[in-house]
Amino acid sequence: MASVSSKRIPGIWSGIGWALADKSAHFPSRLQLAGRALRGALWHGKALRRWMAMVFELRARGIVTDLPSEYLRALRPYVHSGTGVSIRVVQLIDHADWLETALKPAAFTQITSDAPVMLADLPPPRGYQFLRLQLQRAPAQSTEGDLLLALVLQRSPEVQQRAAPVEVATIAFSRFRIEGQGCFVIGGVRGQRHPVLRLSQVELNQVLSGWKPSVLMLRVAQELARFWGLRLIGLDPAHHPVHRWP
């Protein structure tokens, strides 16, 4: 989606046109997202104007580049069903404010440039060039969180020429306040999703020394939450809308 070049803050009604032009819209469809933008402008105008001003400021500072996609974060389906637009805006602003203080300046610049930040370079097993824990910003279309914590490995050139990095496990999460307390809110835990760049179960067990990827990543999330002074919160499966509009 093309970014907006105007030096004036766009009105929230622009969100309807942005939704209709959103090429990434599969779930929800463009019409569904545009309907959400219309209802949001009618019923949650104050919250959305606040979010529009925030995104405009972030774009002016070079922290985000695609203003329409960032604005639509507040209107897309969220993994916790029943989260209204006004609450979602508060969560997004809280997360954006926290991220700038949680990371060192160099890491913040890196992650806002959509480049992954390496948190730990782990000893790679034999036959692998590296095994890393990295943090990166989630795509604007993500329904599960605003950051991705990923375990990434790459085979050594002796084993595979021009090997590409493989994400073997990922946690999607956000940071916002619940009942006044800062929380590390997990929205999704997933394994390998790439149709080609993937490891067999046997190879994965060898690489992780028998650890299940999801269990290992949750342990890492616990340590990160402790480091940041956050409460670790998981999602109640009863509130997880997988194939429906929240």
Where are these regions (language model features)?
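Acyl-donor binding region in acyl/amide transferases
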Residues: 167-246
